[in-house]
Amino acid sequence: MAVRKLAPNTPGTRFASYASFEEITKSEPEKSLLVPLKKSGGRNTNGRITSRHMGGGHKRFYRLIDFKRNKDNVPAKVAAIEYDPNRSARIALLHYVDGEKRYILAPKGLKVGDRIESGEKVDIRVGNTMPLKNIPLGTDVHNIEMKAGKGGQMARSAGSYAVLAAREGVHATLKLPSGEIRKVRVECRATIGVIGNSEHENISLGKAGRSRWLGIRPQTRGMAMNPVDHPMGGGEGKSKSGGGRKHPKSPWGQLAKGQKTRNKKKASTKLIVRGRKAK
């Protein structure tokens, strides 16, 4: 994928860049794999905002993605590479030999006509899925399960991958995109390869309107608010110490710069060998 820059004909196009979509082979999605997507506007079931800066945006359908890859030993042919408005990665439409159709995350290098498969012992080839116990050390993997059978949860965004670093007993050690080194059970599945569309991070929206199309609302700085609205509000001018402040905080008073917020009693903490911010 390449990034396409626009001519600076207007202020909105001066800094804007778009994906070239050159890898897309089909413009209309598979209707049997679509479900309506209702927008929440960042509200929970009580109507209260739980995720700020969300709302509006273009209407979308949700594409049902096969994160579990549990259709074992049934070969599938890649029928199309498609755009998915709900994620940064591209998706691939698979036609299985028994007639079933499924979407998967499209790894880099996957092309229309390729054949892929899932199972305990399948070929080490881009797009194939198998348990970590059968994947060679040093292999780049994505769509990794944290709990066997639950479906992939890690390394799913554009350009993401983890490296299978070691295996010892019932655990495999992975180096994740964040830099975190973490253990997971060897029965957990992962897909071979790197997620495609790696240039996504280089795209510049160029104007506020494109954020609104994506459902992202404006974000007001805490320092620009009043003390009643934010712990960092108040003070005269751009005061960093006025209003009784000492440290930057979230709107709910949690320290925002460097303070660890993970619960130390969480059971999976012992599986993290090295944190993502460790030096």
Curated annotation (Swiss-Prot):
Gene Ontology cellular-component annotations: large ribosomal subunit
Keyword Ribosomal protein among record annotations: yes
Protein's UniProt keywords contain Lipid biosynthesis: no
Gly residues: compositionally biased ranges: 232-242
Region (Disordered): 223-279
One Pfam family named in its UniProt record: Ribosomal_L2_C
GO biological process: cytoplasmic translation
Molecular functions (GO terms): rRNA binding; structural constituent of ribosome; transferase activity
Keywords, comma-separated and alphabetical: Ribonucleoprotein, Ribosomal protein, RNA-binding, rRNA-binding
Residue stretches of biased makeup (Basic residues): 259-279
Source taxon at top rank: Bacteria
Record-linked Gene3D superfamilies: 2.30.30.30, Nucleic acid-binding proteins, Ribosomal protein L2, domain 3
Subunit (UniProt): Part of the 50S ribosomal subunit. Forms a bridge to the 30S subunit in the 70S ribosome.
Family: Belongs to the universal ribosomal protein uL2 family.
Function noted in UniProt: One of the primary rRNA binding proteins. Required for association of the 30S and 50S subunits to form the 70S ribosome, for tRNA binding and peptide bond formation. It has been suggested to have peptidyltransferase activity; this is somewhat controversial. Makes several contacts with the 16S rRNA in the 70S ribosome.
Protein name as annotated: Large ribosomal subunit protein uL2
Native source species: Chlorobaculum parvum (strain DSM 263 / NCIMB 8327) (Chlorobium vibrioforme subsp. thiosulfatophilum)
Organism phylogeny: Bacteria, Pseudomonadati, Chlorobiota, Chlorobiia, Chlorobiales
Gene transcribed to yield this protein: rplB
